[in-house]
């Protein structure tokens, strides 16, 4: 794919961007990207989504689009070329990168199973609650709410587990739009961002996630959704 590099005089027009080939930038979601995913075009056709702060290498500009090589996070997309309309690239990339590189999440059981009413699900759920501490803040989570014999799920086993980068939209199997829409605009952002968990002693996604909601199928599900 031939691309060009705008190295002429600086463009001072409002909303403009000067494309610098070889520059590293990071993805940024717009206010309208409420779920937390930014739609990008794939080289060769089709589209995909990336989350905030994905590391991108600027390849250049062609026909009103800015092209990037994905350098981080989305394992299935690393090394691939994606593009944005030039006017969107103004809003959808930034140079600073993430302020915090990593975080440790410590989860501690808070007693045994209890039945609690969920205002979102409008019914009683049998929950295994825990407290998740992240950056000094304590957040209520549920580790399971669907039990045998009706279901085969169970709480995550104790251990030191790795939190992986978000993989894809989970709207189909676990739409969380209702939680976001229950609060004033802007209270909950990126509700569709799920973080896979690599269990201690295993490799790759265990199909357990850190995500928000009131129903857990063995995930670390953030019950205090507004936090």
Predicted regions and their residues:
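Cell wall/extracellular polymer interaction/catalysis modules
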Residues: 2-217, 226
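A short, glycine/acidic-enriched catalytic loop
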Residues: 223
């Amino acid at each position: 794919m031939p691309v060009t590099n705008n190295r002429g005089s600086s463009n001072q027009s409002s909303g403009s961007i000067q494309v610098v080939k070889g520059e590293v930038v990071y993805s940024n979601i717009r206010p309208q990207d409420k779920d937390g995913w930014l739609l990008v075009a794939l080289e060769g056709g089709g589209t995909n989504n990336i989350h905030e702060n994905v590391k991108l290498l600027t390849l250049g500009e062609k026909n009103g689009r800015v092209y990037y090589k994905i350098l981080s996070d989305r394992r299935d997309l690393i090394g691939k070329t994606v593009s944005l309309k030039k006017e969107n690239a103004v809003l959808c990339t930034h140079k600073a990168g993430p302020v915090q590189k990593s975080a440790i999440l410590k989860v501690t059981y808070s007693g045994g199973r209890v039945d609690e009413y969920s205002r979102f699900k409008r019914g009683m759920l049998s929950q295994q609650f825990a407290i998740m501490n992240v950056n000094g803040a304590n957040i209520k989570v549920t580790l399971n709410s669907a039990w045998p014999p009706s279901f085969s799920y169970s709480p995550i086993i104790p251990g030191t587990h790795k939190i992986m980068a978000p993989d894809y939209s989970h709207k189909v199997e676990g739409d969380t739009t209702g939680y976001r829409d229950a609060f004033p605009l802007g209270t909950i952002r990126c509700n569709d961002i799920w973080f896979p968990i690599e269990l201690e002693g295993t490799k790759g996604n265990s199909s357990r996630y850190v995500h928000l909601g009131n129903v857990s199928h063995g995930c670390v599900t953030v019950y205090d959704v507004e936090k």
